Amino acid sequence: EIRLSLVGSEMCIRDSMEHLQVEAVPDIYVSENGYKVILQGRGLGAIIGRRGETLDAIQQLTNYAVNHGQSKRVRIHIDAEGYRAKREESLQRLAVKVAGKVVKYRKNMTLEPMNAYERHVIHAALQDYPNVTTYSTGVEPNRRTVVAYAPGQK
């Protein structure tokens, strides 16, 4: 079953690359809860897309294709050019910058719409930030994180 998942994920990813007309080679590694796929090649910006939306879509489709009809779920994590780590660092910097402004001006700030994972990164980055709290508002796909002034909050 695991071998079938591996073959299925590689086929799905290669089909996506062909459809996007991008030459990329998937390097697949076994991780603790599934597979990690690192895409290697040139011009991977088309695979990443705006704020990682295309990469997220490829990952979601691959997970669906591999797990459809299977009794045991396997998680496929896909990255290209280290995008996911770079995005996480960028979100953490944004969170701290916004929190500083919120405390300085004592006024809440609402961030741009983000997916659930990106909102989680913001919440986690600020969980111990003094005088600030975070919460999400709105409905997908326009759900946003609010960084709120909360005096005395730790």
Residue ranges and their predicted role:
Residues 22-37:
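Short edge beta-strands and adjacent turn/loop segments
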Residues 10, 14-18, 22-25, 46:
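Internal active-site segments that recognize and position negatively charged phosphoryl groups
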Residues 1-8, 12:
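Single conserved hydrophobic/aromatic residue that forms the stacking wall/gate
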Residues 3, 34-35, 40-42, 50-53, ...:
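Intrinsic disorder
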